[in-house]
Amino acid sequence: MRLFVVPLVMLATCVAHAEPIVVAGMGTLGCATLTAQAPPGSGYGQSSLTMAVFSWVQGYLSAWNVVGIMQSGRFADLTSISTNEQWAHIVGFCQRNPDGFVLDAAREILATRLKMETGAALNR
């Protein structure tokens, strides 16, 4: 029993002093892993993994919009390209950047693909 408790206490100590996590979930999935399991042209609904990745990206883009609207009134129009185009861009980015992450693909969509709009800022 003692041999079990010592490693458990050591593990708890390591977790308690861990660095903060800034990005979690599917955004940390490596591009090589995604492209190995997502054939091009198959759409984001082909598996549980691809649906989870696309859902994470949509949530990331939506959260970016909320912060942008609150701070400056600026937001990305998520309808400026279709969901199929968004998915194709994610897969294409990952094929070109196998060492990248899903987060990187989402950031590139924001920077290069979605139309930016401006409305009234909601500073609070």
Question: Language-model segments: what does each one mean?
Answer:
Residues 14-15, 115:
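Contiguous, function-dense segments enriched for cysteine-driven chemistry
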Residues 98-124:
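C-terminal partner/receptor-binding element of secreted or periplasmic proteins
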Residues 21-92:
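Short N-proximal segments of mature Sec-exported proteins
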Residues 16-20:
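Boundary at the C-terminal end of the N-terminal hydrophobic targeting segment
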Residues 3-14:
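Sec-dependent N-terminal signal peptides
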Residues 89, 93, 105-108:
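Charge-rich, solvent-exposed alpha-helical interaction surfaces
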